[in-house]
Every structure is written in structure tokens, then in C-alpha cells.
Amino acid sequence: MRVTIVLNGRLESLPPVLSVCHALAETGHHVHLITNLIEPENAGELREKGVKITTFRKHPDIRNTSLPVRACRWLSFRWQIWNLLRKEQYDFLWIASAETALLMGKRLLKERYVLQMHELYDTYPVRIRKLKPLAQKACLVFVPELNRGRIFRAWFDLPEFPVILPNKPYRHPRKRNIPLTNEKVKSVIEGLGRDAKIVLYQGGIGKERDLRPVARAVSELGSPWKLVIQGILMGNDEYTKDFLANYEYTLVPPVPAPKHLETAAHAYIGIAAYVHDSLNTEFCAPNKIYEYTGFGLPVIANDVAGLQDTIGRYRAGICINFATADTAEIKHCLEEIDTAYSGYAACAAEFYEACDLKAIIVTAFERLRNRK
């Protein structure tokens, strides 16, 4: 089938969309990716698989701007996309994010498309209201987590259950201690020493991802334990200022996906921290748990439902309430994993291998083909 993927944004900012590009290309579909930005290395690999890539002008940044400016940028994006699609022939559009669908507007309702949604948006009621007709009209809706599928089906009155497409990388090195190709990252990791037990957090740094309990525990354990953080600041609030100034950690510069997997290959334990402040975080679906477990890294996670149903269910690590656990309890988790490391690592690998992205996509597109 001829599939045109549309993404308003930088491809590497949504690793699951990169996985979709590879999976569709490798399962015999003719893929055209339309996006704002893509790293040259990723573009080269996709083109080798026959993926056509078109980039357009920078997507509209609507934050902190007046309503007239936002409206102009929305319309500019909409004009660019539909002008490109007018010249295309495709069987289906793959709308790669809810934001992309909203920016494309009601004209999308006249097309045959599938909709991939990454977040739950429970704190954005206006967005949910506007998404409802777009989700209802989609031939298929893809979401990354089972409970999100249940919630979306109820909210949007969907005629059928969404396809669960976990946020698992389509390609993963799987091998520990692979070479670090980014010189800055290499310098930092090698500077920690060969015997360092790296407790790694990859992702946004902010109050929604409270790392203070882990930082205190790792600090008290002392050498060879090291807390390493690779990510970007999610804000400049008091939490972030306090954490950056008063806690012990090693900061690694962020790199584009999938290069960040090189850092994870040198870790000992992964961290997944989500607070209980919304349905979106309660039923989280982080790609990092697959990125960690692909290397057999056990994970210490907060006890939100999305992590208990994955990491906890497979015993791929330990889930604990970061908000109430004291430093001694977090230390105990780290030491328990350290003591029974091979067992936790085997369970982590089992969790990773239990998901077959290609099979999910093949089955979903068979359903689409039968609807022609």
C-alpha cells in the first residue's frame, strides 16, 4: 500500500514515529514521510529502504504568541501540508500525532487516514473535544498503552478498540557497552570509570519527573554508584533549580534518537519516574522502558499503573512510590537488583522481546486492506 506519513515536528522528537517508518518500509509498503526536520543519518537509512522524504518549513511554534500570530502560523502550516498532499497519490495517510491532525483541520475528515496518538491530553479538554471527530473518522487509531486505548474509546465513542502499538524502538543494538560515537558523551561516560554502576535516567528534567529520591539514594550508596542524567530541561521552575543546584548527578548532553541508545548501553540500571498527577502520567507509555530493557537493564520505576503493568508485571525491575519512599527504601531497591541482577536482567530482556512491532503493523494493515 502507498502510505504517506505526516508529522508536524522533528522526527527524532518522537522515536515511535521513526519505528513506524522502518516497520512500514520493511513490510512492503511504499512510504512517503513528510516532516519538518530529520537527522541526516536517519534520513539516509530510511531512503535506503525506499522511503521518500519531504521536509517543509519549520513548524509553527504557537507558544507564548498572540492569537493572531498563532492563527497565521496554523494557516501557514495547513497550506503547506495540503499543497504537498495535493500532488501525492496514496492509499492512506498516517497522521503521526494528534497535534498534526489538529493543525491539518477539518479537511482531514475527507481523507482515508489512520491516527497515531502519543499522549492522553486529559488536562487539555479543548484539545480532546477537537480531537473527537478526527479520531472517530480515522480508519484506525493507534495508541501506545492498553488503558489509554480504553479511555480514548470511551471519550471519543470509537466504533472499535484502538490498536495498541507500544513505544518500542524498531531497531535496538541489544549489545551492552557498544562504542560511544558522540565525543562529549564518550568523555563523560569514560570519565566515570570502568567499574561505575551507572543508574541512568533519560528524558525530560522537571517536576513531572521527580528524580530527587533516586539522587539521594545513589549519593548515599557512594562509589561505584553514579546517577547519570541525559535529557533536556522541561522548565525553569523552583524544582528544577533546586535539583540542578543541590543534588549529586552527572549530566550527559542529549543526542538525537537513536544515538541515545549508546548511552543506555553503558548503564547498569534504568530509571522511569512519573508522578501521580494526571491520567497521562498514571497510564504512561514511555519508550525509555523498552530502550532500557532492550539491553537487559533492570528498571526502578515509580508505581504508576503504566509502569506496574509493564515493568512490575514482568519483574523487569522494581516499582515503588517515589513520593513516599524514604532514601533507605530506594537504596534497598538498588541493592536488591544488584544482588539478584542476572534474574532481573533476564526478565527485562523477556519484557522487551514480548512485543513484536512488525506483527502488530502487519495485522493492522491487513484490516485496512480488507476495507478497500
Model regions and ranges:
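Nucleotide-activated donor-binding/catalytic signature segment of Leloir-type glycosyltransferases, i.e.
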Residues: 225, 237-269
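A charged, aromatic-enriched C-terminal amphipathic alpha-helix characteristic of glycosyltransferases
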Residues: 180-183, 262, 322-329, 338-370
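Conserved donor-binding/catalytic core segment of Leloir-type glycosyltransferases
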Residues: 4-6, 142, 169, 173, ...
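Acidic donor-binding loop of glycosyltransferase active sites
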Residues: 264-282, 297
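N-terminal strand-loop element at the rim of the active site
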Residues: 10, 26-72, 147-157, 161-162, ...
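Short His-centered aromatic/hydrophobic patch
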Residues: 95-100
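A short, active-site helix/loop in glycosyltransferases that binds the activated sugar's phosphate group
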Residues: 103-104, 125, 137-177, 309-310
